[in-house]
Amino acid sequence: MIRATIILAAVAALAFSAPVPEVPENYDDIPAEYKSLIPAEVSEHLKSITPEEKAILKEVAKGYKDFKSEDDFLNALKEKSPTLHEKASKLHQIVKDKVNALNDEAKAFVKKAIAEGRKIHAQYLAGEKPSLDTLKTTAKTHIEAYKGLSQDAKDSIAKEFPILTGFFKNEKVQAMVGQYLN
């Protein structure tokens, strides 16, 4: 779950910026409307990553198929850069605490979304850019799954991930989903 929130934001940005063929390399290149979807802790994390650390992330991500767990990924980062490992571990713990605070239904939904997002993000970092259809399908799947959650699960997500909830409820997002997925 180390990159969980980043991944969720990245999936959202990828899915809803469909006409843009490249994902921004730098935080400053992310369009303002998508920056507002990124939680403050994640924004600070993204801004703090140096170009050298980005290169390390890309290098480590190339082996994403070999990682059985987040701990495997973190250990690989630690071998390459203790500083990057420390940054990643902090973010990982923030997200893990938020996920663990969710009720069971919400936790299952978020974990599934994180797993999908992690896979797509790792593929992207490894140079295997997912197709637009894959991104569209992933976005649609998660939005529909969110709509199918009980009100208690939605409330639980809203408490821990208010920006994510805003994303799922945002009328502009819904319109964009309809435009790109239909």
From Swiss-Prot:
The keyword Signal applies. GO terms for molecular function: lipid binding. GO terms for cellular component: extracellular region. Residues 1-17 form the signal peptide. It is found in: Secreted. Keywords: Coiled coil, Lipid-binding, Secreted, Signal. The keyword Transcription regulation does not apply. Residues 86-106 form a coiled coil. Belongs to the fatty-acid and retinol-binding protein (FARBP) family. Probably binds lipids. This is Fatty-acid and retinol-binding protein 1. It comes from Caenorhabditis elegans. The lineage of its organism: Eukaryota, Metazoa, Ecdysozoa, Nematoda, Chromadorea. The gene is far-1.
